[in-house]
């Protein structure tokens, strides 16, 4: 269900290929079997694997193969001080990340989902996210538009402003 929701969101943004190929690494054995073993329906099976085993092999595999995850873009800062820093994400992956967050919120919240859910989830953890300042601004803008103006306006903004598509 999650993949279908992400695909629908990506299609609304004009990201057809990304919608079709979203999270295909979940079919790899390390991700698939962890998902099957730790599935709960109310939170990520990666969290359950992390709690049970001390780390999530599925998540470590997943984040390194999917460019719509902010963790994919963490590297050493270019200024040479060896600190970890968020690199700027290409806009199409920011858009896919928003679609992913909306879909996850719909799945986990079920009938209690509102357009504020993705922002509320982000806000709960935002202080520890390692994000490039421009990527943070783009993500927050999209999530606040979703919260305050709704899904149609959020997808319109992503399509026309973030991605620069005409329709």
Predicted features along the sequence, with ranges:
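Metal-dependent phosphohydrolase cores
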Residues: 1-167
């Amino acid at each position: 269900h999650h993949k279908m929701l992400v695909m629908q969101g990506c299609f609304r943004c004009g990201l057809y290929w990304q919608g079709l190929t979203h999270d295909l690494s979940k079919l790899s054995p390390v991700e698939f079997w962890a998902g099957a073993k730790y599935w709960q329906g109310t939170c990520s099976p990666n969290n359950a694997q992390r709690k049970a085993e001390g780390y999530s092999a599925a998540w470590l595999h997943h984040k390194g193969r999917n460019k719509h995850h902010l963790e994919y873009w963490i590297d050493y800062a270019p200024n040479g001080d060896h600190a970890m820093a968020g690199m700027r994400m290409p806009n199409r992956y920011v858009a896919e990340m928003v679609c992913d967050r909306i879909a996850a919120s719909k799945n986990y919240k079920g009938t209690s989902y509102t357009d504020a859910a993705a922002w509320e989830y982000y806000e709960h953890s935002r202080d520890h996210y390692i994000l490039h300042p421009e990527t943070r601004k783009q993500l927050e803008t999209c999530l606040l538009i979703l919260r305050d103006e709704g899904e149609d306006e959020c997808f319109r903004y992503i399509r026309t402003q973030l991605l620069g598509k005409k329709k």
